[in-house]
Amino acid sequence: MNYELVFLAAGQGKRMNAQKNKMWLELVGEPIFIHALRPFLADNRCSKVIVVSQEEERKHVKELMSQLNVAESRIEIVKGGSERQYSVAAGLERCGTERVVLVHDGARPFITLDIIDRLLIGVEQSKAAICAVKVKDTVKRVVKGVVQETVDRENLWQVQTPQAFELPILRKAHQLARKEQFLGTDEASLVERLPCPVAIVQGSYYNIKLTTPEDMPLAKAILGELGGIAND
């Protein structure tokens, strides 16, 4: 099954305490951007990549693409919005070649082809599929610094990206969210409101999102453990 990819690279890096977009921070000699994008470029089923970036960084994205010898016909760069959701919507406007679209956060550099495989099976069966891992830690609900309850973690999952959807469903979900002025934290939260069942497939505990400075040493350790190749 072929798919198009909306690749989000318009982050600000504020929580990373970086002076630039965290996508351009180096991880073992290469930008996080390249680590996160390479598995999709290596997947022949990925027919098109829509990179959503800040307007002032388009030139830098193009330079990186040329270094990776990616055909221009396979890449399109679009301007991101003020919120993640608006950036995804901008990317979706440029989709339409394939029935299925994947959305991925560029700050997750350890995606694997195995996860992509599971997502494509999931979206074929359920029209919407996300990857996730079971919560390991004890979870508390806290109000004003005081524990209110211990949450049963049996049915709790930590959601990751990529997330996979049939394109018409994700577009419809974005249209509804815009109409109702709903702002979600991921695509699945929009699709759930249609309503539409969203299937879960197994992600990876290695598939972390690089958000704060503490994540960088962990990322280097993961890359070392994987031998530079993100396999489950």
From Swiss-Prot:
This is 2-C-methyl-D-erythritol 4-phosphate cytidylyltransferase. The record marks R153, K209 as: Positions MEP for the nucleophilic attack. Its EC number is 2.7.7.60. GO terms for molecular function: 2-C-methyl-D-erythritol 4-phosphate cytidylyltransferase activity. The keyword Transferase applies. InterPro entries: IspD (IPR001228), IspD/TarI (IPR034683), IspD/TarI_cytidylyltransf_bact (IPR050088), ISPD_synthase_CS (IPR018294), Nucleotide-diphossugar_trans (IPR029044). Pfam families: IspD. NCBIfam families: ispD, PRK13385.1. PANTHER family: 2-C-METHYL-D-ERYTHRITOL 4-PHOSPHATE CYTIDYLYLTRANSFERASE, CHLOROPLASTIC. It catalyses: 2-C-methyl-D-erythritol 4-phosphate + CTP + H(+) = 4-CDP-2-C-methyl-D-erythritol + diphosphate. Pathway: Isoprenoid biosynthesis; isopentenyl diphosphate biosynthesis via DXP pathway; isopentenyl diphosphate from 1-deoxy-D-xylulose 5-phosphate: step 2/6. The lineage of its organism: Bacteria, Bacillati, Bacillota, Bacilli, Bacillales.
